[in-house]
Amino acid sequence: MKRRAGLGGSMRSVVGFLSQRGLHGDPLLTQDFQRRRLRGCRNLYKKDLLGHFGCVNAIEFSNNGGQWLVSGGDDRRVLLWHMEQAIHSRVKPIQLKGEHHSNIFCLAFNSGNTKVFSGGNDEQVILHDVESSETLDVFAHEDAVYGLSVSPVNDNIFASSSDDGRVLIWDIRESPHGEPFCLANYPSAFHSVMFNPVEPRLLATANSKEGVGLWDIRKPQSSLLRYGGNLSLQSAMSVRFNSNGTQLLALRRRLPPVLYDIHSRLPVFQFDNQGYFNSCTMKSCCFAGDRDQYILSGSDDFNLYMWKIPADPEAGGIGRVVNGAFMVLKGHRSIVNQVRFNPHTYMICSSGVEKIIKIWSPYKQPGCTGDLDGRIEDDSRCLYTHEEYISLVLNSGSGLSHDYANQSVQEDPRMMAFFDSLVRREIEGWSSDSDSDLSESTILQLHAGVSERSGYTDSESSASLPRSPPPTVDESADNAFHLGPLRVTTTNAVASTPATPTCEDASSRQQRLSALRRYQDKRLLALSNESDSEENVCEAELDTDLFPRPRSPSPEDGSSSPSSSTSSEDEEELNQRRATTRQRNAMRRRQKTARDERPTGPAKSTNTYIGEDNYDYPQIKVDDLSPSPDSSPERSASTLDVQPSRAPPAANMESVERKIYKAYKWLRCSYISYSNNKDGETSLMAEEADEGRAGTSHKDNPTPSSSKEACLTATAQRDQDLPSEGCSSDACKEGTSAGNPNSGAGHEHSSHPWAEVPEGTSQDTNNSGPLEHSFETKKLNGKALSKALSSRAEEPPASPGPKASGSTLNSASGNCPRTQSDDSEERSLDTVCANHNNGRLHPRPLHPHNNGQSSGELETVACSSPGHLDTDHDSPSLTGTFLHKDCCGSEMACETPSAGMREDPPDPSGLDSSKVVHGQSGLKRHRIELEDTESENSSSEKKLKT
């Protein structure tokens, strides 16, 4: 390099020369030269800066030329580097006097480069003076500080983002006790914040769960825009504006970098490359180039990736995915977390898990390595196994995986092994979720084997750095998870090992490459679908789970495992955990399937007819006594409401069916006996039935045959006029009953089948013929039934839907199966009732007549209560048939004719109830005929009373 006048007559570095030289004629010649220089490179020269004692978590160039570089890390120190001096003469950095109590995560220069802000895990932001290295102020937070940004127009204003989910705006001129302005307050952590360089009222944030957002200071607590479209709820860890403030670059966990226009929620481009992965650590990104035409990001595969932003917005194709990096910078020996670009010198700085800061430049620097074509490959290293990491921690004598007490700038094997273990676990977790049929060891090898890394080969420091423990002869191939093909030439022991795992045949390499291609195709397909479809929300949520900043595991976790334990045992334990998880998931699926297949209840009838009462009536117990003292002492006619469309429990149904069946048999036999005995003699069947009832008389009561014939004639005439559907209603409303209250108790406890009280529901009939409803109404005293019916009519209508008379319901013939006890009871009753008309019941509503026999025996069918009467499949059946039976015997009533044979006027409420419930004209005519017949026979009844 020639000496130049005006430069002090001293030799200057390339960086200083490029920044200080003056070109006459075209002021843009320098930018054009540097742009062309970078565009023609396939690799960059690299050089390491040594000074930190631990991981370097934050780096920032100074403004207006990038003359200074500030760095901070796990050693809790803030170092200030003069770039020209550090590159040329290896001058030690300046340590600022303000020291944190824990890891440093973020740094920022003010616009004049006179102050430096640093924040970290100790929940505070320290303001440093660059010239004096003194601490100017401390700003306390409630949690760890992850991001810092200084206002581009006011050096007194800065923003901080912290783990407590708050973005705070601070003014350094305020008193230390003043409260900052809270711009955002979320339950999840903010990892990054940045002022817009052109519009300082706008800020961009990266949240661990809410993704990337744009904020306005004038509108706190509510973001202006949430980027990402339908996939906005993603775990974002870094966000950067370009120099014009028109675009945003963001990093997301387990997803490639994404570029947004600040006015659009949808991404402009996504950038991916084979081998790029971002999952294990918190990283940052930046723009590069004098026109921000490149982007930069570190990766978990120890490489630094540079993509070129296409000039055409449609260049990315489907999903706008830029697949293929412009440049892959290889040289780091562990994960790359931080990267910054200096637009004035085209210099790139990167750092991460290592203690070094690596400088990348298109110009050859003193003591640099590498070339611009990528033909020179450096040595790479093997990954430490988890057992080796535990062994290193235990043998070090310290319980920590990193120790800064010795203040060494050399590579720490424990720290490298710790993050190697993180990478292994992350890849193993990915392989367990993948549907690939390859083994885990193959997936581990292919993930790292394709990403060939250059070694850490600084001429001065590499000789003193300890090498990773070489794999022994007895190690399996799973332990030999290495980073690309290794050229091990420095250690004789390693070179003399015959069975080195670094050698692989062509078939295994081809297998690894093909598997990785399939994996990359799936990733690209998923990325394409994310931008154009809304069907990948679940997959995005799976990828956006919060990953905390890595902490070193406790040494007790692996204390029971000696350093000589093989990876097969580790795989065995992993397989056992997975098998347990699969068994637990399978058991849960079986339980869920069993719950889904479990029947929810008895089958319901799906056929619905007009007039069907579908109201869910309350269930009333069968044994409830009637509250009315004037009605039958046994039960009231309206004591049971059964929902038509819902079957009661089997036990209750069978009990009610048996009662109804017995009562019907007895009623049918007694009625047929009256109709067949026209000679005035009481039927033998009726006598046997009456003799079996407790509390009844055994004396015969002669009845004139003429009155029976008149009764049958009137019944036949009424049968012709009475509709089959409405016959039960008016017959029940007109028929009244009263019994001897003294005989109720004895009759209730009768042991005979026909003496049991009928509590209405259903009867099974023969499907070969139609069902005809039989209702017998024999009047003794019209007061009891009339009151029961009137109380029924006064109840409000239960269902808003229309009701047909009798509340019809279609019931299949098999709804009420007959049990063996029912068949035996039927056979026993058939011996008593020989004449049963082939099992068909004929509707013969009997009007109140004046014979003595009818005055003592009353069997009333209350037709207005819901129940079941099964018919043919095509004919609806009358529901809700209640059988209300009087307790008095015919002989007892004949012995006391004056007490039991008084006639009361019909209760008008009973007549009104029939009009309310049944509105058919045929029923009204039937009621009038019954009233006429009643008036004609009143004279004969009066004679009996006297």
Curated annotation (Swiss-Prot):
Modified-residue entries (Phosphothreonine), positions: 500
Chain positions of WD repeats: 51-91, 99-139, 140-180, 185-225, 277-317, 331-370
Keyword Repeat among record annotations: yes
Compositional bias of kind Basic residues: 579-592
Extent of Basic and acidic residues compositional bias: 691-701
Pfam families: WD40 (PF00400)
SUPFAM superfamilies assigned: WD40 repeat-like
Keywords attached to this entry: Phosphoprotein, Repeat, Ubl conjugation pathway, WD repeat
Highest rank taxon of the organism: Eukaryota
Modification Phosphoserine occurs at: 531, 533, 626, 628, 645
Polar residues biased stretches: 454-465, 760-769, 808-819
Gene Ontology CC terms: Cul4-RING E3 ubiquitin ligase complex; mitochondrion
Bias (Low complexity) ranges: 555-567, 625-638
Swiss-Prot/TrEMBL GO biological process terms: protein ubiquitination
Pathway annotation: Protein modification; protein ubiquitination
InterPro entries hit by this protein: DCAF8, WD40/YVTN_repeat-like_dom_sf, WD40_repeat_dom_sf, WD40_rpt
Region (Disordered): 449-478, 527-656, 675-860, 894-946
Quaternary structure (record): Interacts with DDB1, CUL4A or CUL4B. Interacts with L3MBTL3. Interacts with SOX2. Interacts with DNMT1. Interacts with E2F1.
The protein's role, per its UniProt record: Is a substrate receptor for the CUL4-DDB1 E3 ubiquitin-protein ligase complex (CRL4), involved in the ubiquitination of a set of methylated non-histone proteins, including SOX2. The complex CRL4-DCAF5 is also involved in the ubiquitination of methylated DNMT1 and E2F1.
Protein name: DDB1- and CUL4-associated factor 5
